[in-house]
From Swiss-Prot:
Complex and partners: Homodimer. The tRNA molecule binds across the dimer.
GO cellular component, one term: cytoplasm
This protein's name: Serine--tRNA ligase
Residue positions binding ATP: R259, A260, E261, E346, I347, S348, S349
GO biological process: selenocysteine biosynthetic process; seryl-tRNA aminoacylation
Highest classification ranks of the organism: Bacteria, Pseudomonadati, Pseudomonadota, Alphaproteobacteria, Rickettsiales
Predominant subcellular localization, coarse grouping: cytoplasm
Location in or out of the cell: Cytoplasm
Species: Anaplasma marginale (strain St. Maries)
Amino acid sequence: MHDIELIKKDPELFDRAMISRGFGEQAEKIIELDLKKRGELSTLYSLREQRNAVTREVALLKRSGIECTPQIEASKKLAEEIATLEHSIKEDTKLSNLLESLPNVPDPIVPVGKDESHNVEVRSHGQRRDFAFGIRPHYELGEMLNLLDFKRAAVLSGARFSILKGQLAELERALASFMLDMHTKEFGYTEISHPVLVNERTMYNVGQLPKFHDDSFRTTNNFRLAPTSEVALANLVSGTTLPRDSLPMRFTAYSQCFRAEAGSAGLDTRGMMRQHQFGKVELVSITTSDASNAELERMTSIAEEVLKRLELPYRVMLLCSGDMGFSASISYDLEVWMPAQDKYREISSCSNCRDFQARRMGAKYFFFENKKKHSTLVHTLNGSALAIGRTIAAIMENYQNEDGSITIPDVLRKYTGASAIMRAEDALP
């Protein structure tokens, strides 16, 4: 959500920001609707004062035994006008609807661009492997090994679902444990286990609603299946005012995520790159306004560290204004090398939302200055570290062997108890 006072202070700056995000000029309309609303509220306050004055006059006249029928009629008329105006103000949601539909303002360093072709590479890490044999895509390897079953998943659920078996299911569990251990034991994150069914207010608070109404799954009793742990983790501080010395708060969670993938027809129709349900380890930070820049760099470096320890080649991309998420002010994408596709693919996105989500959530922190208490909105950040399905796909493709087996990265072997993934003989019917 946006601060109207900042929009009014520099409408040209706000318009440039919205244009860069593909939304066109918006400031004039916002200011016009705000003036209308303020005018109506001013009129409402005036009418209430008039009614109160007439009510006092009626009481005085009655005590004095003086006829007051005209004043009583005037009071009734004012009450009707007040009720009509109150209803009109309550029903007029044009301003709030407009503000809710607009994305966050990009940071000054964010490159202006329409789509991912305008993203900027910041750095890369790792050496791409030279294969002496034909590279197989992860979905082909998984089916060869009898460990990845898309056909049976389609029978159970439909398209864009998968079943992992045996060593591949163990690898999934190993990755989640490895990532959570690293985040909690080395980097000070608090692990959270949270509901995956959330109410619509919780989704609204982080910017998932109303803009992306069709992108999440909705139950018949108006719950939503959370598309990311960010939804729950950020909302842990909704409606609170925290002491400054309690920040930063850092949360991590492994959860199943659910996405409708609206508008993705024809994209990544095979494999584990784009699914309706997938596991992900998420990082969320709640911090102060002066510390959020450094917190984003820290969070991004932690996500990178996961890839470094897995020895997967990757690059870091600074997203352009047109490719960022709705609530983000600045985002880095980590893209892992997928040899079978001969290109980098997103495996993590780390974003600073500044006070955009906090304004919706009513999340603040307080501090004392010159013995006076002050409060201001927190800054929220989120990052995936990492998406488990895509990490499995990357390991399968980068660590594949000519015989179809897959070498397990060294860092995971204490979790798997094995050094390689071999073919499973226990086929499902």
